[in-house]
Regions:
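A residue-level signal for conserved active-site and pocket-lining positions in enzyme catalytic cores
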Residues: 78, 104-108, 199, 231, ...
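Mg2+/Mn2+-dependent nuclease catalytic core
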Residues: 178-272
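Hydrophobic (often cysteine-bearing) scaffold residues that line and stabilize catalytic clefts
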Residues: 96, 100, 104, 152, ...
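C-terminal, charged and often intrinsically disordered regions of DNA end-processing helicases
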Residues: 1-99
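Metal-dependent nuclease catalytic regions and adjoining charged, substrate-binding loops involved
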Residues: 1-15, 21-23, 33-35, 220, ...
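Charged, terminal alpha-helix-loop-beta segments
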Residues: 143-144, 155-173, 177-183, 247, ...
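A non-catalytic, helix-rich entry segment at domain boundaries
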Residues: 103-180
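Short, compositionally biased low-complexity segments
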Residues: 73-84, 117-140, 241-251
């Protein structure tokens, strides 16, 4: 097993261990974050959540107030749209390029998991159908049915190949975990912040430093880095040990990696505290602000919202 202070190198074909090696070589070892500093961050987040809950009345039926990772991104776009999404209002049906963008993101998560647990995906489209059927993901299967077979194969085959080239032969010493949950319970259980981490490598039980990895099928966007920082925060508070780095991987590109310093942790905590306060207010009944953008195209409120954007600007889903 590689030493924790050395880049791990496995005997791997193609790029294999090179993917992790490239991340690792770009992450300068940060000053370790003391457990007491993590405890302090948790206490500050808890105090902020308690304060937010004390300023408003939240009905018992709306407890606990849930703040998943997706809520941060939704609120950064539009409060009214975030409420519509959270209350399980069916969004507008996505078609064409938008549907393919969503499918790429769904497929990427499944393909990376398959690569790390069972090996290479050989036939992308049949494999994805099988994976979605196995977990009874009818919504994604319906989305898949909305595009032609040729469109789906053209979009998915290169994705599966890129996953195999980049993730094949990963040193098992890293003990990769996919789609793992990290939750933070605040204000005596009244607020729950959570996220699902795409890939975790290393960590307390492995003898290796921890690395948190987000995989993204679309183009790099500023909010992606903030999402990765949030995951690093949640994992640190879950495990009591901070990962040393976060990375974002986009198929066909070199990974973007950042060491996890205390400053990174504090910035993520401040953003989470602000978002929690905003969401608590909205759940309690505050009128949401409206911020039009390309997301109006799939917002269920667009027919009723006076601020809804009506042009035909499109955006691929990350």
């Amino acid at each position: 097993m590689p030493a924790p202070d050395d880049p791990p190198h496995g005997d791997a074909p193609s790029q294999s261990g090179q993917l992790v090696d490239r991340w690792w070589s770009r992450i300068a070892a940060p000053t370790p974050i003391a457990p007491a500093e993590l405890v302090e961050l948790r206490e500050e987040l808890d105090a902020a959540a308690v304060a937010a809950m004390s300023r408003v009345h939240v009905d018992a039926d709306d407890l606990p107030v849930r703040v998943p990772k997706s809520r941060l991104a939704d609120l950064a776009r539009c409060e009214r749209s975030a409420l519509a999404s959270a209350w399980s209002v069916d969004p507008r049906r996505r078609e064409g390029a938008e549907a393919l963008g969503l499918l790429r993101g769904i497929a990427l998560d499944h393909f990376v998991t398959h690569q790390l647990t069972e090996g290479r995906v050989l036939e992308a489209l049949p494999a994805l159908v099988s994976m979605l059927t196995a977990v009874a993901d009818d919504e994604s299967l319906e989305l898949l049915d909305s595009v032609s077979i040729d469109e789906a194969e053209t979009a998915l085959a290169p994705l599966a190949a890129s996953v195999a080239d980049s993730w094949g032969g990963l040193d098992p010493a890293w003990m990769p975990r996919t789609q793992s949950r990290a939750s933070l319970v605040l204000a005596g259980g009244a607020v729950i912040c959570s996220g699902v981490v795409d890939v975790e490598l290393g960590g307390p039980t492995t003898g290796l430093p921890g690395v948190v990895i987000e995989v993204k099928s679309g183009r790099p966007a500023p909010e992606h880095q903030a999402e990765a920082y949030l995951y690093a925060l949640l994992v640190a508070l879950r495990d009591g040990v901070a990962p040393v780095g976060v990375a974002r991987w986009y198929p066909g590109s070199d990974p973007a990696s950042t060491p996890v310093t205390l400053g990174v942790r504090e910035a993520a905590a401040a953003r989470l505290a602000d978002t929690t306060a905003t969401w608590v207010e909205l759940v309690a009944g505050r009128t949401p602000e409206e911020s039009p953008g390309v997301w109006c195209r799939w917002c269920a409120e667009s027919d009723r919202c006076p601020s809804a954007r009506t042009d035909d600007v499109r955006e691929s889903h990350p």
